[in-house]
């Protein structure tokens, strides 16, 4: 297994969508459908996406189509950042990582109850905190170190880009098999420590420089 990690760029939009269409939730995950775009969307944009779902016919199918269209456009516009893991040219894993200033919210949340847009706490400017908000690995590749490879790449690139910290937001109430923000132990192994808590969200940081 020769895994390659690539930073998401607009020309990888097709691979990104293909991953979420066919492999990310092939085990019947309760998070399907998802295209990992809501972190980068304001509540107004999310409401617009709900209206678009109605135009697509409503119901689960309309919602999936609306999510998909929105995510594809956001990748092409460079609004979603992160890393795809590939095995023989097929995307099998994803990590959503971006400048903290580019997220409207972090931590676990349900799209049926989206938290209000909030200015980032503990982050005053760009290039200070690289945030890691989500992991998704194809079921047959879980437990093989793919998330660790993705996390290591995020931290290495963040250091090279001049960030002071990498920051993650695992939950203390979600079983590890469903923890799309990543389990605590993943971050502990990579040198992250608890920085603060916001409700059930554990804010974990790693000092990069």
Regions found by a protein language model. Give the residues of each.
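Conserved acyl-donor/pantetheine-binding loop and adjacent beta-alpha core of acyl/acetyltransferases
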Residues: 73-77, 86, 90-134, 142, ...
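Conserved acetyl-CoA-binding loop-helix of GNAT-fold acetyltransferases
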Residues: 116, 132-137, 143-159
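Conserved GNAT acetyl-CoA-binding A-motif
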Residues: 129-132, 158-177
């Amino acid at each position: 297994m020769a895994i390659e990690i690539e930073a998401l760029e607009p020309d990888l939009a097709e691979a990104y969508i293909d991953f979420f269409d066919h492999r990310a939730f092939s085990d019947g995950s309760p998070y399907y459908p998802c295209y990992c775009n809501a972190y980068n969307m304001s509540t107004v944009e999310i409401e617009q996406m709900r209206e678009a779902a109605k135009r697509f016919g409503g119901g689960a199918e309309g919602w999936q189509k609306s999510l998909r269209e929105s995510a594809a456009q956001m990748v092409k516009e460079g609004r979603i950042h992160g890393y795809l893991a590939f095995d023989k040219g097929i995307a099998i894993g994803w990590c959503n990582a971006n400048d903290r200033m580019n997220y409207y919210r972090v931590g676990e949340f349900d799209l049926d109850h989206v938290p209000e847009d909030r200015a980032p706490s503990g982050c005053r400017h760009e290039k200070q905190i690289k945030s890691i908000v989500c992991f998704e690995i194809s079921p047959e590749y879980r437990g093989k170190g793919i998330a660790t490879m993705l996390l290591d790449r995020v931290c290495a690139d963040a250091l090279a880009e001049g960030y002071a910290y990498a920051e993650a937001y695992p939950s203390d109430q979600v079983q590890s098999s469903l923890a799309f923000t990543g389990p605590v132990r993943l971050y502990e192994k990579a040198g992250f420590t608890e920085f603060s808590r916001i409700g059930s969200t554990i804010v974990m940081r790693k000092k990069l420089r």
